[in-house]
């Protein structure tokens, strides 16, 4: 047993799973795996009872994850406040669009988290809401806006990064060579999160029937982005 419990990789897994983001994204991955299996089994001709087992698992995991929205609402409200302090005066000479994009993103995320929390209270019947379906739709719209804002921010950061790389490439000093390596590493991070946000954005867009894709694609996108998040948490927990 000591071989298992004292194994560095085992200890690393436990340390990672002790963090809330890692647990949430792991549950999210399982949620979309259940969604993918229910979709595959349905179109594969499996019995309705078998399909419903996986749909029920997906629904239960989704329901339990909504409770995490309590902390997320407070977190995003705090971010919105600090983002508002960074908003630039339109008459100022600063042309950076990031503060405005960040403010829009966090307002939208706050709206989505609030809608999720209301949905949780409604389903538990602690605070029934007669407009739960409309609020759920608004929540999906907020999520789509937030993720598309994140994509826009990624495009803006990529543009700025490209300018810096071009400038650093034109210099031949050792200092600029180190700076270039840092910028190239930063570029990989920007592209990673841009891809993640773009894939995540397809989920609410599909649920709102704006993007015409099947549940299999949505589930695959959800699994991919969840594993991407788990990977980042894994790297960060070393």
Curated annotation (Swiss-Prot):
Example GO BP: peroxisome fission
Mitochondrion in keyword set: yes
Bilayer topology annotation: Peripheral membrane protein
Signal peptide: none
Keywords: Membrane, Mitochondrion, Peroxisome, Peroxisome biogenesis
One GO cellular component, as annotated: mitochondrion
Pfam short name (any one): PEX11
Keyword Endoplasmic reticulum included in the entry's annotation: no
InterPro entries associated with the record: PEX11
Cell location: Mitochondrion; Peroxisome membrane
Biological function: Involved in peroxisomal proliferation. Promotes peroxisome division and biogenesis.
Annotated family: Belongs to the peroxin-11 family.
UniProt-recorded name of the protein: Peroxisomal biogenesis factor 11
Species for this entry: Schizosaccharomyces pombe (strain 972 / ATCC 24843) (Fission yeast)
């Amino acid at each position: 047993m000591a071989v298992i419990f004292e194994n560095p990789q085992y200890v690393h897994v436990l340390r990672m799973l002790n963090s809330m983001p890692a647990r949430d994204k792991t549950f999210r991955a399982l949620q979309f795996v259940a969604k993918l299996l229910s979709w595959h089994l349905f179109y594969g001709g499996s019995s309705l009872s078998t399909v419903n087992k996986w749909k029920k698992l997906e629904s239960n995991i989704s329901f339990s994850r909504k409770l995490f929205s309590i902390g997320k609402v407070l977190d995003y409200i705090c971010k919105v406040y600090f983002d508002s302090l960074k908003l630039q005066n339109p008459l100022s000479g600063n042309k950076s669009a990031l503060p405005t994009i960040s403010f829009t993103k966090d307002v939208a995320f706050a709206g989505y988290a609030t809608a999720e929390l209301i949905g949780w209270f409604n389903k538990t019947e602690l605070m029934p809401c007669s407009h739960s379906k409309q609020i759920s739709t608004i929540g999906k719209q907020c999520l789509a806006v937030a993720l598309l804002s994140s994509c826009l921010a990624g495009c803006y950061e990529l543009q700025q990064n490209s300018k810096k790389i071009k400038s650093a490439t034109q210099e031949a000093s050792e200092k600029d060579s180190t700076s270039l390596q840092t910028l190239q590493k930063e570029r990989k991070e920007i592209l990673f999160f841009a891809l993640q946000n773009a894939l995540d954005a397809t989920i609410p867009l599909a649920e709102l029937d704006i993007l015409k894709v099947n549940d299999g694609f949505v589930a695959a996108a959800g699994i991919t982005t969840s594993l991407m998040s788990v990977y980042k948490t894994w790297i960060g927990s070393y």
